[in-house]
């Protein structure tokens, strides 16, 4: 069964997650907060890129790259679906290799329990 990533859409959801816990590394910052009274079959996650990272082409490349890695992570590791996640990208995502970013995401999401 393929797991799906659902995007956060309401600004209230973003504000709520920003009040939760935070995990940072050189590529991105992950904010996460436990969902109350929900058993999700979908992963609630959004990827945010700031305008200072570059033009729309670069920002969309970062988002595509991180979404692709997250789809791989869903298949390979046990991600906790009882949390909502907000991933804010940093400029080093564009500069470093795909495999380094992938390994970092895998280890970070295994740490979140």
Residues of each region from the PLM?
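Positively charged, solvent-exposed patches that mediate nucleic-acid binding
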Residues: 1-113
């Amino acid at each position: 069964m393929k797991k799906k990533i659902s995007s956060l859409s309401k600004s209230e959801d973003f504000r709520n997650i920003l009040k939760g816990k935070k995990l940072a590394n050189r590529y991105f910052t992950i904010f996460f907060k436990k969902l109350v009274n929900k058993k999700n079959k979908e992963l609630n996650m959004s990827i945010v890129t700031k305008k200072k990272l570059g033009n729309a082409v670069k920002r969309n490349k970062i988002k595509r790259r991180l979404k692709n890695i997250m789809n791989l992570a869903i298949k390979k590791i046990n991600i906790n679906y009882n949390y909502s996640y907000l991933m804010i990208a940093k400029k080093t995502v564009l500069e470093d290799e795909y495999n380094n970013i992938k390994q970092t995401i895998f280890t970070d999401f295994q740490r979140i329990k």
